[in-house]
């Protein structure tokens, strides 16, 4: 019997909303330009899986970097992004606009979208947002596992800003002006709602779980899911066991599908997405 392939299904556009693979590549843990059975993905396996578009996240860990190094590490990531795309130009191309996305995917190549995960990369300066945009960044995740100058993280018990900060609201408005995608995965509950309130454009949660299924502060409540959907946004269900189920048993594809179904039931199928 012939193995099932992604290409056996009706034609559609498949976009993976989040991967840390570029960070792994930067750190020398994996070469995503070469096929491998290790790690989340590489270009060869993406092609085999029928992936049309991929958001590559660059993030600098505050536990590994010092304040003042965050922006430069993110800029280093933009260079790494350009380098891997150039090495595999026959299979993948960086895209910065919807028209470029359509052109690249129509040509049968993977559209690579660059993101920065964690507003701490701005180091409290809005001009760094413009710098990132000029370097091709089109997605910014407001927080990572740490609160920053833009707002509070779901992982931070202190919540210093009580949601989105004044600078965070300015950053949201600037991203709206630039046409960037705003990502609220990792954000504290109030940061999510404040971001939705401040943004004139749809907002995504690129890699989150469902709190109704797994009571975990990184996961979204039903109220947040409905609010993101009402704003025209999309939620990507994260493929990590401790986001998907309460028990410590190994998660299965059924757990992922049940989370996607939950979003479809309370917000509609247009708002359920696929992360890495």
Task: Give short role names for the model-derived ranges.
Residues 14-22, 187, 205-209:
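Histidine-centered catalytic micro-motifs
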Residues 1-159, 215-275:
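N-terminal hydrophobic targeting/anchoring segments and the immediately downstream early-domain regions
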